Protein backbone atom coordinates (compact mmCIF):
# COMPACT_ATOMS: atom_id res chain seq x y z
CA UNK A 1 0.00 0.00 0.00
CA UNK A 2 1.23 3.47 -0.80
CA UNK A 3 1.72 5.93 2.03
CA UNK A 4 -0.64 8.35 0.28
CA UNK A 5 -3.45 5.74 0.19
CA UNK A 6 -4.07 6.58 -3.47
CA UNK A 7 -5.80 3.83 -5.42
CA UNK A 8 -3.45 3.52 -8.39
CA UNK A 9 -3.21 -0.22 -8.87
CA UNK A 10 -5.07 0.09 -12.20
CA UNK A 11 -4.94 3.66 -13.55
CA UNK A 12 -4.58 4.60 -17.20
CA UNK A 13 -4.69 8.00 -18.86
CA UNK A 14 -4.36 8.79 -22.53
CA UNK A 15 -5.00 11.74 -24.83
CA UNK A 16 -6.25 11.08 -28.31
CA UNK A 17 -8.77 11.66 -31.06
CA UNK A 18 -12.14 9.92 -31.25
CA UNK A 19 -11.95 7.78 -34.39
CA UNK A 20 -15.35 6.07 -34.34
CA UNK A 21 -18.82 7.49 -33.90
CA UNK A 22 -19.90 6.91 -30.27
CA UNK A 23 -22.48 4.15 -29.76
CA UNK A 24 -24.97 4.79 -27.00
CA UNK A 25 -27.01 2.06 -25.35
CA UNK A 26 -28.87 1.29 -22.16
CA UNK A 27 -28.42 -1.96 -20.23
CA UNK A 28 -31.45 -4.00 -19.09
CA UNK A 29 -30.83 -2.61 -15.60
CA UNK A 30 -31.21 0.95 -16.95
CA UNK A 31 -27.53 1.99 -16.89
CA UNK A 32 -26.51 4.14 -19.85
CA UNK A 33 -23.31 3.32 -21.73
CA UNK A 34 -21.32 5.06 -24.44
CA UNK A 35 -18.59 3.28 -26.43
CA UNK A 36 -16.11 4.62 -29.00
CA UNK A 37 -12.57 4.14 -30.30
CA UNK A 38 -9.81 6.53 -29.23
CA UNK A 39 -6.68 6.86 -31.36
CA UNK A 40 -3.43 8.07 -29.78
CA UNK A 41 -0.17 9.03 -31.51
CA UNK A 42 2.91 10.51 -29.87
CA UNK A 43 6.70 10.44 -29.76
CA UNK A 44 8.17 8.97 -26.58
CA UNK A 45 11.77 8.78 -25.37
CA UNK A 46 12.92 5.29 -24.45
CA UNK A 47 16.56 4.56 -23.52
CA UNK A 48 17.57 7.86 -25.11
CA UNK A 49 15.87 7.14 -28.44
CA UNK A 50 12.67 8.56 -29.88
CA UNK A 51 9.97 6.00 -30.42
CA UNK A 52 6.60 6.48 -32.05
CA UNK A 53 3.72 5.34 -29.87
CA UNK A 54 0.40 4.55 -31.49
CA UNK A 55 -2.75 2.82 -30.31
CA UNK A 56 -6.44 2.52 -30.98
CA UNK A 57 -8.30 1.61 -27.82
CA UNK A 58 -11.98 1.06 -27.13
CA UNK A 59 -13.34 3.38 -24.43
CA UNK A 60 -16.47 2.66 -22.42
CA UNK A 61 -18.30 5.24 -20.35
CA UNK A 62 -21.03 4.09 -17.99
CA UNK A 63 -23.40 5.83 -15.62
CA UNK A 64 -25.37 9.04 -15.67
CA UNK A 65 -22.63 11.32 -14.31
CA UNK A 66 -20.30 11.02 -17.33
CA UNK A 67 -22.90 10.24 -20.00
CA UNK A 68 -23.88 13.93 -20.21
CA UNK A 69 -20.32 14.79 -21.30
CA UNK A 70 -20.51 12.25 -24.12
CA UNK A 71 -23.29 14.17 -25.89
CA UNK A 72 -20.69 16.50 -27.45
CA UNK A 73 -18.20 13.75 -28.37
CA UNK A 74 -17.94 13.28 -32.14
CA UNK A 75 -15.41 11.78 -34.53
CA UNK A 76 -12.37 14.07 -34.40
CA UNK A 77 -12.92 15.26 -30.81
CA UNK A 78 -9.61 15.58 -28.93
CA UNK A 79 -10.00 14.30 -25.39
CA UNK A 80 -8.12 13.13 -22.31
CA UNK A 81 -9.55 9.97 -20.77
CA UNK A 82 -8.62 8.71 -17.29
CA UNK A 83 -9.88 5.43 -15.90
CA UNK A 84 -9.01 1.76 -15.51
CA UNK A 85 -8.38 -0.96 -18.06
CA UNK A 86 -9.94 -4.39 -18.16
CA UNK A 87 -10.32 -7.19 -20.65
CA UNK A 88 -13.48 -7.76 -22.70
CA UNK A 89 -14.07 -10.79 -24.88
CA UNK A 90 -15.02 -9.90 -28.47
CA UNK A 91 -17.69 -11.73 -30.47
CA UNK A 92 -14.89 -13.69 -32.17
CA UNK A 93 -13.61 -14.85 -28.77
CA UNK A 94 -10.51 -12.64 -28.64
CA UNK A 95 -9.63 -10.71 -25.49
CA UNK A 96 -9.30 -6.95 -25.93
CA UNK A 97 -8.22 -4.27 -23.46
CA UNK A 98 -10.91 -1.65 -22.87
CA UNK A 99 -10.48 1.67 -21.06
CA UNK A 100 -13.39 2.30 -18.67
CA UNK A 101 -13.51 6.07 -18.31
CA UNK A 102 -13.89 7.73 -14.94
CA UNK A 103 -12.90 11.22 -16.11
CA UNK A 104 -13.06 12.94 -19.52
CA UNK A 105 -11.66 16.32 -20.51
CA UNK A 106 -11.92 17.99 -23.90
CA UNK A 107 -8.63 19.30 -25.33
CA UNK A 108 -8.72 22.54 -27.35
From Swiss-Prot:
A cellular component term (GO) from this record? primosome complex
Looking at the record's lineage, which domain of life comes first?
Answer: Bacteria
Protein's GO biological process? DNA replication, synthesis of primer
List, alphabetically, the Gene3D superfamilies matched. Answer: Nucleic acid-binding proteins (2.40.50.140)
Q: Which InterPro entries does this chain map to?
A: NA-bd_OB-fold, Primosome_PriB/ssb, Prisomal_replication_PriB
Q: Which UniProt keywords apply?
A: DNA replication, DNA-binding, Primosome
**Which Pfam family, any one of them, does this sequence belong to?**
SSB_1
Citing just one GO molecular function, the answer is: single-stranded DNA binding
Positions of the SSB domain: 8-108
* Function comment: Involved in the restart of stalled replication forks, which reloads the replicative helicase on sites other than the origin of replication; the PriA-PriB pathway is the major replication restart pathway. During primosome assembly it facilitates complex formation between PriA and DnaT on DNA; stabilizes PriA on DNA. Stimulates the DNA unwinding activity of PriA helicase.
Family designation: Belongs to the PriB family.
The subunit field of the Swiss-Prot or TrEMBL record says: Homodimer. Interacts with PriA and DnaT. Component of the replication restart primosome. Primosome assembly occurs via a 'hand-off' mechanism. PriA binds to replication forks, subsequently PriB then DnaT bind; DnaT then displaces ssDNA to generate the helicase loading substrate.
Protein name per UniProt: Replication restart protein PriB
- Taxonomic path: Bacteria, Pseudomonadati, Pseudomonadota, Gammaproteobacteria, Pasteurellales
